[in-house]
Amino acid sequence: MEVVGLLCVAVAVLTWGFLRVWNSAERMRSPEQAGLPGAGSRALVVIAHPDDEAMFFAPTILGLARLKQQVSLLCFSSGNYYNQGEIRKKELLQSCAVLGIPPSRVMIIDKREFPDDPEVQWDTEHVASTILQHIHANATDLVVTFDAEGVSGHSNHIALYKAVRALHSGGKLPEGCSVLTLQSVNVLRKYVFLLDLPWTLLSPQGVLFVLTSKEVAQAKKAMSCHRSQLLWFRHLYTVFSRYMSVNSLQLL
């Protein structure tokens, strides 16, 4: 009976925490407290493949828009691993439109030097110079990309982190340009949101974005634009993955 009672208390606490957070649109510190540029600033989200923006960065994109930042997106490949590049470009534009990013602020590199291939190591210096060009062209105040583990461990994701890290450590970023990296978490935290929630809220945070239920529906709608990628396991991903509703990020 004691075990049952403890389980009931645990479930009640988790449910309370879930409901407390779920429909709050302000689950992060002020931009100034977090070290972020304020309203009117320009953010550049740097991804490797079409669908990264919906699978991983939707909470950040919607959260930055909520903070009145102008969000642009730089995608390094067309996702042509299965010769679907042209289809995936169109899907990316549709997804970005759902997330509030117009086509004029979506840049797709799609060069042979940056193939969608986990077996190919992108050249860090080349990636870095390309990112820097777009930072200058867009007068960027904030760069957002993957962390050292790339969330899923994909080498193309990690290549982006290495490039941005090189720019940051080398002092090549424009003055006042900040960098946020998306925190990778273990499989249990990634797919069991109720268990992850208390850990996320109690852990030291750089920046935390938690979507409202309405925004989660928006993120799922963006993901549904990637029809060529919606295999059965990705449907499960949209239901269970924390990255459809929560992003925790760290400043470099």
Swiss-Prot record:
Q: Which residues lie on this side of the membrane: Cytoplasmic?
A: 23-252
Q: How is this protein positioned relative to the membrane?
A: Single-pass type I membrane protein
Coiled-coil annotation reads none
**TM spans, by residue?**
2-22
Which GO BP terms, alphabetically? GPI anchor biosynthetic process
Q: What Gene3D superfamilies has UniProt attached to this entry?
A: LmbE-like
Known pathway:
Glycolipid biosynthesis; glycosylphosphatidylinositol-anchor biosynthesis
| InterPro entries reported in the protein's UniProt record | GlcNAc_PI_deacetylase-related, LmbE-like_dom_sf
Q: Which reaction does it catalyse?
A: a 6-(N-acetyl-alpha-D-glucosaminyl)-1-(1,2-diacyl-sn-glycero-3-phospho)-1D-myo-inositol + H2O = a 6-(alpha-D-glucosaminyl)-1-(1,2-diacyl-sn-glycero-3-phospho)-1D-myo-inositol + acetate
> Which domain of life does the UniProt lineage start with?
Eukaryota
Alphabetized GO MF terms: N-acetylglucosaminylphosphatidylinositol deacetylase activity
Location(s), subcellular: Endoplasmic reticulum membrane
Which keywords has UniProt assigned to this entry? Endoplasmic reticulum, GPI-anchor biosynthesis, Hydrolase, Lipid metabolism, Membrane, Transmembrane, Transmembrane helix
Q: What is the E.C. number?
A: 3.5.1.89
The UniProt entry lists the main location of this chain as: endoplasmic reticulum
Q: List, alphabetically, the GO terms of the cellular component aspect.
A: endoplasmic reticulum; endoplasmic reticulum membrane
Briefly state the protein's biological role. Catalyzes the second step of glycosylphosphatidylinositol (GPI) biosynthesis, which is the de-N-acetylation of N-acetylglucosaminyl-phosphatidylinositol.
> Which protein family is it in?
Belongs to the PIGL family.
| PANTHER family, A to Z | N-ACETYLGLUCOSAMINYL-PHOSPHATIDYLINOSITOL DE-N-ACETYLASE, N-ACETYLGLUCOSAMINYL-PHOSPHATIDYLINOSITOL DE-N-ACETYLASE-RELATED
Query: What does the entry note on its domains?
Result: Retained in the ER by two retention signals, one located in cytoplasmic domain, and a second signal in transmembrane domain that is functional in the presence of membrane proximal residues of the cytoplasmic tail.
Record-given protein name:
N-acetylglucosaminyl-phosphatidylinositol de-N-acetylase
